[in-house]
Amino acid sequence: MRKSPGLSDCLWAWILLLSTLTGRSYGQPSLQDELKDNTTVFTRILDRLLDGYDNRLRPGLGERVTEVKTDIFVTSFGPVSDHDMEYTIDVFFRQSWKDERLKFKGPMTVLRLNNLMASKIWTPDTFFHNGKKSVAHNMTMPNKLLRITEDGTLLYTMRLTVRAECPMHLEDFPMDAHACPLKFGSYAYTRAEVVYEWTREPARSVVVAEDGSRLNQYDLLGQTVDSGIVQSSTGEYVVMTTHFHLKRKIGYFVIQTYLPCIMTVILSQVSFWLNRESVPARTVFGVTTVLTMTTLSISARNSLPKVAYATAMDWFIAVCYAFVFSALIEFATVNYFTKRGYAWDGKSVVPEKPKKVKDPLIKKNNTYAPTATSYTPNLARGDPGLATIAKSATIEPKEVKPETKPPEPKKTFNSVSKIDRLSRIAFPLLFGIFNLVYWATYLNREPQLKAPTPHQ
């Protein structure tokens, strides 16, 4: 019996439709299962990477030198301690290297991991040469980041707070500038095994955040990077160095030290305008200003380390102290000559009272009696000459006027000393010249940034 062609076509259409629907129904669950198994794929990749991995061995052991590329992002810089010669810095410290043992193939090109994986693989033993104390942040979890690319390149980032040494040369204090270094390198691997390089060009290898400065007495001018080799008893090591350039702000010290010193010197010179006979007033001026300068000198040194050399501020205070002390010595000199000498100005003359001349007559009972002995001549012979002498001897004596001498000019005190007149001009002039030379020298001087050779 022959089948109808229309029925057979219809049957084949139904079979194709059912097969298509069946295939879709079976395919949809398999795609969902694949998406759900991504975590399984990650786990399998990590397990395969760590299978037989020895984190005690550096990458390329026995074949090549391990290159570690680094860069730093500074989130906070400061404060800086002059007394301890150190500074504090908060950074994101990034290191990148290649480990062929960690190559993988999978649906992803980068594995984004945390600190748990970092503890299972080899990482550089980087330490800070001039670090006094370094802290890795652990709240709420260790602040570490790990990225592994499919070609085995790793990026390892951690957040650190480092308190590092900053050798300071304070000869120009407080107009000084410093280059505070941050030095790091491998602790155990010599340059024949591990070398460090900057990830980018020097200008971009170390970046400071715009709001990262935490400095009150300094301006952060910028930073420079460098690298070098340090020789030690165990070999040669690569050391990466970053210098942060600081310039001190002088405003605080002008208000706290310089202006009080200048005003004290000016106050000491006021005594030149007082009379040299004003001993108590001038003594108070001299002693008070000397004690004030002593107090200022002591307080200015409290915020600085005990260095064996004189700073620019020490020189200024010393000169001011010399001016104040010289003003006191000047008064002592004037007072010395005032007691032992007179200076006649030719104008002030005190008339001298007339001196009484001794009267040849003796005053007795309010009457004058001649001091000569009276005798009676013998007139018996009748000599007319003798009679005349006798007559004259009996005449009453007349009153004798005292002799007077013309008044002589008397020497008087001159209240203004020649030394005072000279000091009124010389002291302010010399102090002004000193200030002009001092400020012109230190403000226009280029700072000498010295950095000692690092050592291990």
Swiss-Prot record:
GO terms under cellular component: chloride channel complex; cytoplasmic vesicle membrane; dendrite membrane; dendritic spine; GABA receptor complex; GABA-A receptor complex; GABA-ergic synapse; plasma membrane
Gene Ontology biological process terms, A to Z: chloride transmembrane transport; gamma-aminobutyric acid signaling pathway; inhibitory synapse assembly; synaptic transmission, GABAergic
Positions of 3alpha-hydroxy-5alpha-pregnan-11,20-dione binding: 273
Membrane side Extracellular: residue ranges: 28-253, 302-311, 442-456
Annotated signal sequence range: 1-27
Lineage top rank: taxon: Eukaryota
Disulfide bonds: 166-180
Regulation: Allosterically activated by benzodiazepines and the anesthetic alphaxalone. Allosterically activated by pentobarbital. Inhibited by the antagonist bicuculline. Potentiated by histamine.
Residues at which 4-aminobutanoate binds: 94, 157
Outcome of mutating residue 269 to L: Reduced potentiation and activation by the agonist alphaxalone
Glycan attachment points: 38, 138
Catalytic activity: chloride(in) = chloride(out)
Cytoplasmic side: 275-279, 334-421
Family matches, as CDD domains: LGIC_ECD_GABAAR_A1, LGIC_TM_GABAAR_alpha
GO molecular function: GABA-A receptor activity; GABA-gated chloride ion channel activity; transmitter-gated monoatomic ion channel activity involved in regulation of postsynaptic membrane potential
Pfam families reported in the protein's UniProt record: Neur_chan_LBD, Neur_chan_memb
Alphabetic keyword roster: Cell membrane, Chloride, Chloride channel, Cytoplasmic vesicle, Disease variant, Disulfide bond, Epilepsy, Glycoprotein, Ion channel, Ion transport, Ligand-gated ion channel, Membrane, Postsynaptic cell membrane, Receptor, Signal, Synapse, Transmembrane, Transmembrane helix, Transport
Compartments where found: Postsynaptic cell membrane; Cell membrane; Cytoplasmic vesicle membrane
Domain comment, as recorded: The extracellular domain contributes to synaptic contact formation.
Subunit and partners: Heteropentamer, formed by a combination of alpha (GABRA1-6), beta (GABRB1-3), gamma (GABRG1-3), delta (GABRD), epsilon (GABRE), rho (GABRR1-3), pi (GABRP) and theta (GABRQ) subunits, each subunit exhibiting distinct physiological and pharmacological properties. Interacts with UBQLN1. Interacts with TRAK1. Interacts with KIF21B. Identified in a complex of 720 kDa composed of LHFPL4, NLGN2, GABRA1, GABRB2, GABRG2 and GABRB3. Interacts with LHFPL4. Interacts with NLGN2. Interacts with SHISA7; interaction leads regulation of GABAAR trafficking, channel deactivation kinetics and pharmacology.
Protein purpose: Alpha subunit of the heteropentameric ligand-gated chloride channel gated by Gamma-aminobutyric acid (GABA), a major inhibitory neurotransmitter in the brain. GABA-gated chloride channels, also named GABA(A) receptors (GABAAR), consist of five subunits arranged around a central pore and contain GABA active binding site(s) located at the alpha and beta subunit interface(s). When activated by GABA, GABAARs selectively allow the flow of chloride anions across the cell membrane down their electrochemical gradient. Alpha-1/GABRA1-containing GABAARs are largely synaptic.
Entry's family note: Belongs to the ligand-gated ion channel (TC 1.A.9) family. Gamma-aminobutyric acid receptor (TC 1.A.9.5) subfamily. GABRA1 sub-subfamily.
Misc. remarks from the entry: Functions as a receptor for diazepines and various anesthetics, such as pentobarbital; these are bound at a separate allosteric effector binding site.
Protein name per Swiss-Prot or TrEMBL: Gamma-aminobutyric acid receptor subunit alpha-1
